[in-house]
Structures are given as C-alpha cells and as structure tokens.
Amino acid sequence: MLEELECGAPGARGAATAMDCKDRPAFPVKKLIQARLPFKRLNLVPKGKADDMSDDQGTSVQSKSPDLEASLDTLENNCHVGSDIDFRPKLVNGKGPLDNFLRNRIETSIGQSTVIIDLTEDSNEQPDSLVDHNKLNSEASPSREAINGQREDTGDQQGLLKAIQNDKLAFPGETLSDIPCKTEEEGVGCGGAGRRGDSQECSPRSCPELTSGPRMCPRKEQDSWSEAGGILFKGKVPMVVLQDILAVRPPQIKSLPATPQGKNMTPESEVLESFPEEDSVLSHSSLSSPSSTSSPEGPPAPPKQHSSTSPFPTSTPLRRITKKFVKGSTEKNKLRLQRDQERLGKQLKLRAEREEKEKLKEEAKRAKEEAKKKKEEEKELKEKERREKREKDEKEKAEKQRLKEERRKERQEALEAKLEEKRKKEEEKRLREEEKRIKAEKAEITRFFQKPKTPQAPKTLAGSCGKFAPFEIKEHMVLAPRRRTAFHPDLCSQLDQLLQQQSGEFSFLKDLKGRQPLRSGPTHVSTRNADIFNSDVVIVERGKGDGVPERRKFGRMKLLQFCENHRPAYWGTWNKKTALIRARDPWAQDTKLLDYEVDSDEEWEEEEPGESLSHSEGDDDDDMGEDEDEDDGFFVPHGYLSEDEGVTEECADPENHKVRQKLKAKEWDEFLAKGKRFRVLQPVKIGCVWAADRDCAGDDLKVLQQFAACFLETLPAQEEQTPKASKRERRDEQILAQLLPLLHGNVNGSKVIIREFQEHCRRGLLSNHTGSPRSPSTTYLHTPTPSEDAAIPSKSRLKRLISENSVYEKRPDFRMCWYVHPQVLQSFQQEHLPVPCQWSYVTSVPSAPKEDSGSVPSTGPSQGTPISLKRKSAGSMCITQFMKKRRHDGQIGAEDMDGFQADTEEEEEEEGDCMIVDVPDAAEVQAPCGAASGAGGGVGVDTGKATLTASPLGAS
C-alpha cells in the first residue's frame, strides 16, 4: 500500500525531508505530529493477517532480490552521506535527526518469473533491446528540467537540493535481473548502514542470471535507479515491480524500460489486462515495505544480512492489490513529485537569482573599484601631466628670463658703446670748437673794416619819352642810348661840308644800293661797376664743381615720367637723335635706340628700408653745422662776440647784454631760415695807380675812390656841444608835443600811429607850437628853422618817443590803449586829452572790434572810417586785442608797445646814435613834476663817440 508522507518518508528521502521540516514555514504544524513518537510505527495490515505477514517476511528474507537490496542500501548510504554533509544534529520538539531514518525493508519474494510493469506504457510487451531504455532515460532528463523551472519556493533550498541529489541511486541500466555488480556505492551504503546502527555486512552481492548470461552493469546505468519513500525510480520516473503469481513461466523476462511520468500514460486497465488475474498484481513482499514504512509508529525493520547469491523460491504467496489503490498511490506520488520538482525549481530559481544578484553586486563592486582605480590613475596621470607642464613652464620661463637677461645685457653694452662713441664725438667736437674759437680770436686782428650802411639811392624817374609816361628806373635798369654810334667832331664837320656843297651829280638811290649799313655791338650795361660802388669787397664766384656738366655741351635736362609706373622718373639729359620718330610720325618706334620688349618697370625693385638713424640724427646735424662752418671760412657767425668784446661801461649790465645777444641770435636764425647761402669773400688786390695812367685804370680808380682820404672839418669848441645837444632835445620836445594828442588814448598800434604822424608832417597839417615847454625855466636856445620843421621825423625817433613817454595797457577807464605818463601830460599842460583820442585820420586805420564798440564813446566824424575798410580789417584782427592781462606799472616791453600789430621791422639808426635808457621805478614815475625833472635817469647818447648828459625826456 502506497501513501503520501506528510513530513517525510523514511529512508533516504525521509531523512532529507525530516531535517527540512524545521525550516519550512509554509508546511502546517499538524504534519509534525507523527514526529513525536519516532519509534512507534503504525501497522496498516489487519491483525488477522499479521501472522501471515510475519511468515511471509520470514520466507521473503531469503528470496529478496539482491539488486533491490543493493539499491536500497545505496539509497540509504547516499542519504546518510548527504545528510552528514548538509545538516547538523539539532533537536526540535524532542525530535532528533535519527527519528526519521526509518529502515525500510522490502521483503518481496521474486520468483523465477518476475515482471516489471510500466504503468505509462501502452502494452506490457517486453522490449527487445536496450535502445528504448536509453532513449527513455534521455527523455526523462528534459522533462525533469522542464518541471524544475515551474516549482515554487516552499522551504529551505539547500536542504531540499541535497535530499533530491541523494535520491539518485545506482541501478542496472538494462534489466533488474541479478547481475553481479561491484560498485563504489556499496561501500558508501555500508558506511551508512553502520551509522544507523544496522548490522548489515558490506560484501559483494551476486545477482542471479535472469537473462541469457551474466553481464557487468556500468556505473552510469546504476546511477539512473533510485528509491524514495518506498517507490522505485529510474531517473525521476516511478517504477512498479510485479511478480507473477502463477510462476509458470521461467524467470527469463527482460525488464521493461521505464518512461517518464510526463509522457502519455496508458490506462491501468490496459496494463492489467495483460495478466491472467486482475486483482493479483503486486506481491505481498513488494508492498510490505511501503506499508510498513508509511506508519511512523511501526517498529523499524531489523537489519538483515545479504548474501552474494539468493535463490528465487518456486512459489511466493501474494497479496491482492486493487487497481484503484495502485492508481491512487501513483497519483499521489506524481503530485508529490511534481510539488517537489516545483519547489526545487523555485529554490533553484531563487538561488540563481541570488547568485545573479551577488554576481551583479560583485560586478558592480568590481566595476566601482575599477572605476575608482581608473579615476585614481587618471588623477595621477593628470597630476603627473600638470607637474610636467609646470616643470616645462618653469623651464621655459627660466629660459626666457635668461634670454631676456642676455638681450638686456647686449642692449646695455650697445648703449654703453653708443654713449662712449657719442662722448668721444662730443669731445672731438668740443676740441674743434675750441680750435675754431682760437682761430676766430686770432682772426680778429685781420678783420676787414665794415663799411657803414649808406642810405638808399633816391628813385629816379625817366624824363618825357615822347608818348611814354614817366617810369621808374631801378638799380639794375639802364636807359638805352638814343644814338648807337658815337658822335665825333670830324664826322660833324664832314656833314656840314656836304650840306654846303650839294650837287645833283650824286644819285641818292645809287648811294642807298651800294652803301653798307653801319654795325654796332649790343648795348652792354656793366653790373660790376654798380657792385663796386655799393661794396668795398668784390665778390668772386668760386669755380663750378667738377661733377656739374656744362649745359651748352650736354643740352637741356629732360624729365621722363609715366603715371602708371612704380619706377621713379628719369631726370637728366637725352642727346641721342633718331631719324624715325618725327613730328608727323610721333608714334613710330626706333628699335635701334630703344628696346620696346623690355619693361623696365617690372625689373624695378624697391630698396629695403635702411637702419634707424634716431641715434645718428644729431651727428648729421653736427656734420651739417661743420659744413656750414667750413663754408664760412674764418668768419664767425653773426652776433658772436669773444670775451670782453663789444662790452663798454654803459653796457655792463648783464641782463641787457643777454637781451641783445638773444635778439642777435634770433636775427641770425631768421637769416638762416630764409635759405641763404654764404659766399666766400675773397680780397681784391689793386696795385698802385699812377696819375699818368688814370685813363687806363678807370675801374680801379673808382674802387679806390671809395677809400680816398678826406679832410675832416675842425671840431667846434667844447661849448658848442651843449647847444647841439639842446637842439636835439628841443626837437624831440617839439615832436612829442605834436604827437601827444594822437598818442594818448589811441587803440591802434605804434605802426599806425607813426604812419599817421608822418603823413601829417608830410602834408604840413601840424602846427609849430601845439605844446608848451616842460618847465617854465626851459628856454629855447635855438629857434628851429623852417627846414627843420618841415623835416619828417624818422620811425626810430617816433618809436623811441612813444616807448619812453607812454604805455599800452588796460585801465578801468577804458580798454587797452596807449596812456601817456601823467608827468609828461602835466609838463605839456595837456591833462585834458580825452580817452579815446579825438584825432582826424588822413590814412586808413583798422576798425575797432565789435565786442569793444559798445564801450567806446562817440568820437565824432573825425574818428569814422569807411565801411569797406572796417569789413576788411575785421577779418584780419590780431589775437592780441583779446588779451586781458594787466601789465605792471613801469614794465615796458616790445610787445606792449606794438599793440595789435608787432613791429618786426628793423629799426633804422638815425645819425648813428645809440641810446641806453634806465627805466625808473614806479615810485619815481609818480613823483611830482619838479622832482621828476631832477631825478630823471641818465641817458647816454653816442654821437661820434661823445657822451652827453641826461635830459628830462629820459625819465618816463
């Protein structure tokens, strides 16, 4: 009788499942009730048959199949080995690991005719060969794998897996006949039996020959058979072992190969129809073991000794098992096996998932470590690269610094060399200047006497020339003679004779035909004579340089230039003549003279820019100055004075000396700026001229007459010098008295005032007595003659009087204009002069600016000017009229005197006088009139190297 074990069947599988019960939370608690009495077995056999069963068991001990006992021992040994490996002895609810190890004794009496019936086959025919068995065995494994994939997780995976692995027992692959097999599992089974306390002996077992002859079972086929829970499995397929009740046939029946449970199974009716009796299918010995092991309370079977050979009994008592019972047991086994397979599949799946997770964790951990390691390597690599780059940058920086230091040293050395060279040049230049200065000082002894300036010759006007109007004859112009031939007295007397002795014999027509016209040379005007009279030195032109060609010989200079060419134009001579290019054919080509195929513009190459001459510009200037000095010869520049040269007691003031030096230097610079070159003056040597040879040496006489000795008149007595000085002072007083009305309050410049005053004097519009003497005590020692009154004062005298007696400044009363000093106005009794002045102009004067027109009071028609002159002068006003700077009292300068227009013309020296004026302080200027005349500064007048006393006009 087969039944499903709730907690675990005894045997190999029961041992595995019993140890797993404690770890399975899914199983109910009621299934553990049977474990409380481990040694009590339930006897499912009726009491009436107990004796029979004991007898049957006693008889079946000798008739047991050796192969089944070996398989069971192997199963138990495998279970013990697996349990020892997988479990530890623990007590749960008083139940130990040996409680579920129930010894299963299968007491079956297998007769000579033993038949193994596979309930899954369609017929009970015996297979002819072993091929079907191997095929079914191979088909069982995929079905098992398919079932394992669908199991559920209901318990401990490890314990169940070990139990399933221990269920595999070694069974013959071909038949169940008693074949002598000697395997390693027997030793294991012996060991397992010893552990359970069984007294089985490990000895080789002999299987009786059920087939044609004895065969050795291979190890692989033995492993395919197993027993679990009293059910015999081949692989994973349960097998049922039947015995023939009749025992008629000889025991030469081959075992049928088993097929998996998963395949198509035939109904049990078809299986049982092959036997003579339907009710007697299984023997009592084949089912005694399952029935006895199904009850945990039944007593364990005593251990038995197995011999190597066991003869089959001729007759074995059998027990009837119904088909319904067999079918139920089979279904239960199938369900249990399916559940075990599902559970095992789930456990395997969970284990695979766990292993996969662990594998993934390991891989993630390994990947993380690799990433960390890689990151560290990258970090180290970057640090190494950064360190190498920093070292490289430091090396480059050090190299650059070294190169920079070397370049700096080179520049410093070059600069020092240049400075040394410049210092040497300056030293050489200083030595040359010193030599020149020494030469110039020595040359002062041999200096030529300079001729004083002569007044310009008056303009000469040609007389009436018929229909031509009179015209001016300039210095370089000469009137042509009216008669080319010279008039001789002989020719004149001959003409008179011919006129007196006229006769008709001579024909005038014949005379005209045969007479030859007279010839005369060109009218030549000698320019040398004019130069000789104007200068005491004859200027001799130096010969032309060797490199200058003669124009007459080489012809005119020509310019060949084209706008589309980059090549510079040609400037020079072109003397080649051609016979092909003419005026009528200007575009003809002369291939003999010119090559028209060559483009000279393409061959032109621009010159590379030269080196910088910033350091040598001063040298060039020095060279130019040296050249000019060489051209000047032994003459020193204008204004150059040696030590103590030209210094007199009157000129001892260093400030005035500096001012004069600056003025002369400025004049010299302006003269050089005009681009005038100097010519070397060479002396002309003229020998003695005798009185007899005057006609021959007429030109030389004219030159020498300029230096002829003349007798000077005897100088007057010393007393006569004082009236002469007084005369000049009186003339200045007279001019100043007439100038005051025009000067005081005038907004125009000194040039306009001087020109207007001279024009008035030229027209005779000024009265002789417009002013009074400076003081009552002053008396005229000499009455001016009409010629003196009619004489026009010079510009220099008028300018001197204006600068001495007035100042050009801005005062609260009026804007910038000329203000005469109060003491001067008081001395001439003209304090009432208006500001601005009321003067009737006879010349055109510039109009006043618009911004100041409002502050200027009306001056009547005398101050008005034409509108055209106003418009014309408004656009050319000087910027100095907008200057609002207040001058200090007593400060007189050239700019203050000139007003709107600066006087840049040179002052003409009148009568060779040179006056040095000492300007008093402001306190002296504002002194009373009486004190002013006595405290006036001294004025030195150099007239023929004579020093005169000061006059009251000297004080300002």
Swiss-Prot record:
Q: Where is this motif: PxVxL motif?
A: 233-246
Chain residue ranges for the region called Binds to p60: 660-956
Compositionally biased region (Low complexity): 282-296, 307-317
Any idea which GO molecular function terms this record carries?
chromatin binding; chromo shadow domain binding; identical protein binding; unfolded protein binding
Could you tell me at which residue positions the Glycyl lysine isopeptide (Lys-Gly) (interchain with G-Cter in SUMO1) crosslink is annotated in this chain? K182
What's any GO biological process attached to this entry? Answer: nucleosome assembly
Protein's UniProt name: Chromatin assembly factor 1 subunit A
The beginning of the lineage is:
Eukaryota, Metazoa, Chordata, Craniata, Vertebrata
